Each structure stands twice: as C-alpha cells, then as structure tokens.
Amino acid sequence: MSDTHLSTQKFADFPLHKEVHQALNEAGFEFCTPIQALSLPILLEKKDIAGQAQTGTGKTLAFLVATFNHLLSTPIPAERQLNQPRAIIMAPTRELAIQIAKDANLLAKHTGLKVGIVYGGEGYEVQRKVLDKGVDILIGTTGRIIDYVRQGVINVSCIQAVVLDEADRMFDLGFIKDIRFLFRRMPDAKSRLNMLFSATLSMKVQELAYDHMNEPEKVEIAPNEKTSKNIKEEIFYPSMEEKMPLLLSLLEEDWPEKAIVFSNTKHSCEKVWSWLEGDGHRAGLLTGDVPQKKRLRILEQFTKGEIDILVATDVAARGLHIADVSHVYNYDLPDDCEDYVHRIGRTGRAGQKGISVSFACEEYALNLPAIESYIQHSIPVTSYDSDALLDDIPPPVRIHRKPSTHTRNTRDRGASRPQGGQRSGPRRHDRTRRHS
C-alpha cells in the first residue's frame, strides 16, 4: 500500500485508550489519513461530527477508533442490560457492514468489547443467537436492526455512540425513515457520541445531521475535488455496434488484474457478462437478482483473485469495498452524476493509482455534460482505431448455462502467460487507443 495518502499525524500522539493503541500498533497503523487526522481530535473531545469523505480515505478506521475509545472511557449506563449494545454503526448495504465488522474485530482484540453484525438476506436466527449472547458494538443494515428492535431482541435506549456511514446512499436507497425511527428510540443526542460520514454533505444529509445530532462539526476532505487525483480518466465515443468490441479490445490491451465493469441495467450487465465469459474472461455478475449467498461467494472470489472482472449495476455494487481494483469501465454512462463519482471511486483508493474508462454511446452520451459539470472538469477524450478492434470474438455464452471449463479457454493468470491470455485463435496486436 502506498503511503502517499497519509498525513504526518501519528495515532500515538492521540490520548487513546491503551488497548486501542495496542490494536492499532499490531495492525500496522502508525500515521493517520487526512480524515482521521481531522476527525479524531474532535471526536476525542466527545463532540459530534458530520464528515465528508469518499470511500478509501480511512473514514472507517476514524469512526471505529472513536467508538472503541468512547466506550472504553465512558461509564456504562446503570440501566443497561448486559446483552444490549452500547454503540450502533449503520451501513446502507450488507457488504459494507461486513467490511466494517472485519475492521472492528481488529480493534476489539484486547478491549473486551464484543462486536456483532446483523443484515438482511440470510441467517436471521443465527444472528439473533449472537445478539442474545450480548454485543457491545452492533454493526448492520437498518432494516434488520429495526426487525430486532421491534421484536424486543435489541434495546437501543442505552446507546452511547452512533455511526451513520455513507449517509447519502441511505437517502438513495430510501432508508432515512428507518434511521429516524431508530434515532427516536435512542437517548437524547447530547447523551451520546454521534458520527455521520457521507461522500457528499448535501442539504438533506446536513438536515438529518442537525435533526439527530448535537451541533456536529463539519469535517471535509478536498471538498472541491469530487474525483481523486490518483485516478486517470478517459472517455471514448463508440457507436452502438462497436461498443462491445471496444470493451473486449481494451480489456485485451489493458489486461487488468482486477476490474469492475458498470452498466446501467440488469439486462445490459447480463449481456456484458455473457460476452466476457464467451471471450474467456473470468467474470462475475452482480445484479439485484443475484441471491445473497451467491453474491457473497462472487465477492469472495473477486477479492481472492479467482475472478478478474466484476460486472455490476450501481445498486448491486453499492457498499462494496474491495482493495486493489486497478480499472473501472463505465460501459454505460450513469444517469446520476453522483453514481459516476461512486463508480470510479472503486479504484485509486488508499493512495494507489487507478484507471477509469467510460463509453459515451448514442444512448447515454447526453449524460456527459451534467457529469462533467458535477465533477468540475472535462474527461479527456481518447479516440480509437476501428480497424484495430478484435475481430475474432467468440459468441457470448447463455446467461443460464454455466460454461464448461473443458470447452472454453480461460485467462491464464500465471506470471508467464502471454499478453491476451491463452486462446485457441490468434489475437490482433494493433493498439486500440489513438492518442493525439
């Protein structure tokens, strides 16, 4: 991991509880990222914050350190039942909740504090048994948390710390009523430490903060830069007929180690996945129709490198936090400007470099002016040579038929594999991009 995203502020300089310091040291955290350096001094004074920061900036560790330190240094309410949570961390998606829980368990090692996670889609009774045994810090999605609150499994009347992560996505997914429901059942805002983080501090997000928090201080990281300088952006103008050949040619040329291809609809994602599979790429498909267990398996394969390319819709990809994504391909330009920022923010994280490639086809090119206005810069245009596009593309596989590994060639991920992978037919060696 590159250290170029770190500040000169050390965690050791903060008056943290010794068990928190020990966990940070063992995990290899020495220097703070900017959001950590700005937010922790405020939070350690037990003041609320509303932080603006993109994913990959270290905000998760910021609110986890503050939460653990707050619970370790604050007396437990006398009326609190032993198995009831003292802190709640709410996330918009189960994948984000799972990632937060993994990070929380790193800090929990020496503290004696128990971490629990709940989310919809699976394991209702299993999760309930964990809650019955008792948790100090509850991490989860709002819908499942509310289910347990309404059934009397969870009591939030003694909550001492609250985190609302990716608040803007909470609005997008329609969870704000659920959040307000939970806030109204917690102690007064002045009686707890409140933390809100969002990629954008829109008026509706700020209104939520001021309604349910105690005069939160705003903390903003590079508020004028909606996209990271670590991401190289480029855009192509393909015809509809050349859109798929261009994508396959660029994948052949770039040969990304880990890439995400975004498309606007489930049908389009299935089409892209079918062509990638037919061309021998190790691809995974994430749409709203993918069952939760299969979804988690695909994400695990992608994280481990067993899958190289993830094809996803915006809704299905929300909350994903996967390290080392080298390329993002916008097969379709998104209709929502904020989705463009969230999409390309999957790469170029934690100080690493990333590449974003977008297609402005006839159907979605009209979205470009609004996107460029929102990100406050023009996306560099790259032309391409139609004659250099791949012309030996195999047919797509059927979406409901798992391709046989014995009848198709797949990408050889070995270090000695030739550029373009091992396929039965020759590939063109022409360069697709034409730079002026």
Swiss-Prot record:
Region (Disordered): which ranges?
A: 392-436
Q: What is its EC number?
A: 3.6.4.13
Task: State the protein's name.
Answer: ATP-dependent RNA helicase RhlB
Of the GO CC terms on this record, one is:
cytosol
| Enzyme category, top tier | hydrolase
From the broadest rank down, the organism's phylogenetic lineage runs: Bacteria, Pseudomonadati, Pseudomonadota, Gammaproteobacteria, Alteromonadales
Residues noted as binding ATP in the record, renumbered to the chain? 53-60
**What is known about what this protein does?**
DEAD-box RNA helicase involved in RNA degradation. Has RNA-dependent ATPase activity and unwinds double-stranded RNA.
The record places the motif (Q motif) at: 9-37
Chief location bin: cytoplasm
Q: Report biased composition (Basic residues) as residue ranges.
A: 425-436
| Domain Helicase ATP-binding, first and last residues per copy | 40-219
The segment(s) forming the Helicase C-terminal domain are 243-390
- Keywords in alphabetical order, please: ATP-binding, Cytoplasm, Helicase, Hydrolase, Nucleotide-binding, RNA-binding
Motif DEAD box covers 165-168
Q: How does it assemble?
A: Component of the RNA degradosome, which is a multiprotein complex involved in RNA processing and mRNA degradation.
What chemistry does it catalyse, as a reaction equation? Answer: ATP + H2O = ADP + phosphate + H(+)
BP GO terms, sorted? RNA catabolic process
What Gene Ontology molecular-function terms does this entry list?
A: ATP binding; ATP hydrolysis activity; RNA binding; RNA helicase activity
Instruction: Show the SUPFAM superfamilies listed in the entry.
Output: P-loop containing nucleoside triphosphate hydrolases (SSF52540)
SMART domains xrefs = DEXDc, HELICc
Q: Where in the cell is it found?
A: Cytoplasm
What the entry lists under Pfam families is as follows: DEAD, Helicase_C
What is the similarity comment for this entry? Belongs to the DEAD box helicase family. RhlB subfamily.
